[in-house]
From Swiss-Prot:
Lineage of source species: Bacteria, Pseudomonadati, Pseudomonadota, Alphaproteobacteria, Hyphomicrobiales
Protein's name in the database: Glutamate--tRNA ligase 1
Gene: gltX1
GO biological process, one term: glutamyl-tRNA aminoacylation
Motif interval(s): 'HIGH' region: 9-19
Cellular localisation: Cytoplasm
Length: 457
């Protein structure tokens, strides 16, 4: 058996960090088991689904390193769903209902008043053909419900009916179908709700494992019933915990909360995003994995907590810095060249500045510092300005090396009597225009004698 998983986003908005957790969990599970990953767009809502969102999802996944083995669109598979609908109707497992939303709400309140579970009472099963025809003559169109197998022979005598599965994340799970309403699978306008196309596609595409958020746990009991009604063996399920904002609010792709695109535009490394999305809310320590292979080594569905996990952007900042500070030159080289940073001193430059980067784009600033004019004029007091001028008069001749900074500052210390911060800070400001940054012993060699002299105040 080939392990086959799927990620099925709705292209009605941009995917956020929570969706990323699901996509990466499926991708890593498939990778660790030599399996296949299907990207399946749940675009049956033709009014809200947009191609621009589908394209954005593809771009986001590619940026994260998730490359599908197969891409499908549910909007192109309506004929397949129609056949499944007819199969369920023929088996007497899909029945027509005509209630309006207001009528259903009144019935729900009535059941609550009678201390009964607020589930659908299957009143539509009692309708005669003549009554159905009369309702349709009024202009009503039926929606179609799936008859849950929570009874022996009389659908109005429901009884406790347990659906069991061994969840990859949560362990043994049980759902009682008697506590649930028969789900609507087909709307009045003939369009499909999520449940039916999802099951039909999982069967047709040979999906063996479904890994998704734990907000689908109850829904799994219904879907297992539909799998069996269509004559298929249900796949293995795994339900990971959900991510929330730092304040505990749920993430929504429609509000753009922590969307993958916004994180990319903010300059985060894809592996920083992937590492946090996968490792947060698990028993694993949250560290930055340099690549997907390394992240896969730490990926274990059994390590996921059953409680929701709060996504803290400050953790993402720390992971991003960690990746940049450890990034070897060969990995950074193509990106440096794209920014015009190349030549004999490119490697020594990268090794000098990487430890001070929050975002990769920060290298452009430091390249300007070592190879051009200062982006900002140094803010030196009169006394410090005189000190720097004296210090620059003591600059040693080239060639310079890693010891030049030490020998120069020792000479300046002897000549001026300054030491510590009073010595180093004015020199840093004069050389870089900033109070903080990479080691000056490394930067001085990169700046060179002539450019250093040009910065004499």
């Amino acid at each position: 058996m080939t392990v086959t998983v799927r990620f099925a986003p709705s292209p009605t908005g941009y995917i956020h960090i929570g969706n990323t957790r699901t996509a990466l969990s499926n991708w890593l599970y498939a990778s660790k088991n030599n399996g296949k990953f299907i990207l399946r767009y749940d675009d049956t809502d033709v009014e809200r689904s947009k191609d621009e969102y589908a394209q954005a999802i593809a771009v986001d996944l590619d940026w994260l390193g998730v490359r599908p083995d197969r891409v499908e669109y549910q909007s192109k598979r309506f004929d397949i769903y129609a056949k499944a609908v007819e199969k369920l109707k023929t088996a007497g497992l899909l029945y027509a209902c005509y209630e309006t939303a207001d009528e259903l709400e009144r019935r729900r309140k009535l059941r609550l008043a009678r201390r009964l579970p607020p589930v659908y009472g299957r009143e539509a099963l009692k309708l005669t053909d003549a009554e159905k025809a009369a309702l349709e003559a009024e202009g009503r169109k039926p929606h179609w419900r799936f008859l849950l197998p929570n009874f022996e022979s009389d659908p109005f005598a429901t009884q406790r009916t347990e659906v069991h599965w061994d969840d990859l994340v949560r362990g043994p799970q049980t759902v009682d179908l008697a506590s649930m309403s028969d789900p609507i699978l087909v709307r009045e306008d003939g369009t499909y709700l999520y449940t039916l196309p999802s099951v039909v596609d999982d069967i047709d595409m040979g999906v063996t494992h479904i890994i998704r958020g734990d907000d689908h746990v109850t829904n799994t009991g219904v879907q297992i019933s539909i799998f069996k009604a269509l004559g298929a063996t249900p796949p293995v399920f795994g339900h990971h915990n959900l991510l929330t904002t730092i304040s505990g609010e749920g993430l929504s792709k429609r509000t753009g909360a922590l969307s993958v695109g916004s994180l990319r535009e903010a300059g985060y490394e894809p592996m920083a995003v992937a590492s946090l999305a996968i490792l947060i809310g698990t028993s694993e320590s949250v560290t930055a994995a340099p690549d997907m292979a390394a992240l896969a080594e730490h990926f274990d569905l059994a390590s996921i907590s059953k409680s929701s996990a709060k996504f803290d952007p400050s953790e993402l900042d720390a992971l991003n810095r960690s990746l940049l500070h450890e990034m070897p030159f060969e990995k950074a080289k193509p990106r440096l060249e794209a920014l015009g940073i190349c030549g004999a001193k490119a490697e020594s430059f990268w090794l000098a500045v990487r430890g001070n980067l929050d975002r990769f784009s920060d290298v452009s600033h430091w390249w300007q510092v070592v190879s051009g004019d200062l982006p900002e004029a140094p803010d030196l007091s009169g006394e410090d300005r005189d000190f720097v001028r004296h210090a620059f008069d003591l600059l040693p001749p080239e060639p310079w090396n890693g010891q030049t900074w030490k020998s120069w500052t020792e000479a300046v210390k002897s000549a001026t009597g300054r030491k510590g911060k009073n010595l180093f800070m004015p020199l840093r400001l004069a050389l870089t225009g900033q109070a903080h940054g990479p080691e000056l012993a490394d930067l001085l060699v990169l700046v060179g004698l002539e450019r250093t002299k040009s910065r004499r105040p």
